[in-house]
Amino acid sequence: MWPPNAENNHCNYSYHEHAELNPHDHYHHHHYPHSSVHHTECYQTLSCPSDLPVETSYYNSVPPSYQDLGQTDLSPQFWCAEVDCVHERCSTKEIPHEQSKIFEEISKECDHIMNSAGDCEKCQVEHENGAQEAIPINDLVDIVMQTVDNLKKEGSSNDETKLLSRKRQQNKVAAARYRDKQKAKWQDLLDQLEAEEDRNQRLKLQAGHLEKEVAEMRQAFLAKLAKK
């Protein structure tokens, strides 16, 4: 029974013998289009042994030769196609609709940040003097990612509308907090500037008084020298 005696592209296994192969034996079986002794096309399913890592797909690699497929080196390049695999880890799962919508919205926000944030009024901070400054890209990305993290921590909900509404509200709150933080920072800089200007004015007045005293002392000294 094992190994199969495959000569001239013919397999000595019957249909039932093929069906009785376990997943590990499937892997070692000569997986190559050939005819069985019953003249039935043999496309034996490759299966992923549990002791092998999932690295590449069988159909994503160059089709191996008959001799290559007959080797028993457990080469990871010979993987089963996803449609044939019996292991859950190789199967594809459809992303839930609500998660897909959130991903789509976040993708649009990221695209907006990268391409249009500099010209968007909503993405700029307006200071007390009326000047506008674009929010740095890193800060905008942090706002979006923080919102995603908050959603993950709160857990998923079955109500798509509620999830999207919560996400939008959290984005608004995060953006408002950032604007308040930037305004406070800008106001602090204005206060520091005003304090420095007051200090500069006081120093100028003090320097003027000192220069006046020096001039008066010079005149008094010269007057004493003249009397002598």
Curated annotation (Swiss-Prot):
Annotated ranges, domain bZIP: 166-224
GO molecular function: DNA-binding transcription factor activity, RNA polymerase II-specific; DNA-binding transcription factor binding; RNA polymerase II cis-regulatory region sequence-specific DNA binding
GO cellular component: nucleus
Deleted gene: phenotype: RNAi-mediated knockdown targeted to the intestine, but not to neurons, hypodermis, muscle or germline, reduced the resistance to infection by the Gram-positive bacterium P.aeruginosa strain PA14. Reduces expression of pmk-1 pathway dependent genes, such as systemic stress signaling mediator sysm-1 and infection response gene irg-4.
Factors inducing expression: By exposure to the Gram-negative bacterium P.aeruginosa strain PA14.
Keyword terms of this UniProt record: DNA-binding, Nucleus, Transcription, Transcription regulation
Basic motif: annotated span: 166-202
Main location: nucleus
Domain of life: Eukaryota
Tagged with keyword Phosphoprotein: no
Gene Ontology BP, a term: defense response to Gram-negative bacterium
Protein localization: Nucleus
Residue ranges, annotated region (Leucine-zipper): 203-210
Binding partners and assembly: Interacts with CCAAT/enhancer-binding protein cebp-2.
Annotated family: Belongs to the bZIP family.
Function noted in UniProt: Transcription factor. Involved in modulating innate immune response pathways, acting to promote resistance against infection by Gram-negative bacterium P.aeruginosa strain PA14. May act as part of a feedback regulatory loop with the pmk-1/p38 MAPK pathway. May also function in concert with CCAAT/enhancer-binding protein cebp-2 to mediate immune responses, independently of the pmk-1/p38 MAPK pathway.
Protein name: Transcription factor zip-11
Species of origin: Caenorhabditis elegans
